[in-house]
Amino acid sequence: MTTTTVFDLDRFARAAEERDASTQLSMYGPEATVTIADRITQPGSPRVLTGTEEIKGWIEDVAARDMTHSVTHRVSGDSSAAFTLACRYPNGTNILCATVIEVEDGAIAKQIVVQAWDES
């Protein structure tokens, strides 16, 4: 009998909202990749993080920032998940991230993040 490990999107979302970097990181596979596209690292040359050490630095940086995080629009399936993440700094600057995740053996294998923020 084969057992399938399901990705717990609710747990991941809770960790993001609570800025719990350790729990978030524990949900990535050892060879995971995260691709980030935004105004600075545009789609033609996105930022690509490979492996949990590189991903750890990014997650810890985001979790340490003084901002609120709210996960919305969650969708999950057997081997994928997606959500939006709305963030806000105390000065009122907003960030919106759309994320698509590919899951293997219950862990994040690939993640694509597209983010935009207020500019004044």
Task: Outline where the language-model segments fall.
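A beta-strand edge to alpha-helix "cap/lid" segment located at domain peripheries
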Residues: 56-120
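Short, low-complexity N-terminal intrinsically disordered segments enriched in polar/charged residues
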Residues: 1-26, 30, 120
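Generic helix-packing signal
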Residues: 17-19, 36, 115
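A solvent-exposed, acidic/Ser-Thr-rich amphipathic alpha-helical stretch
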Residues: 23, 27-76
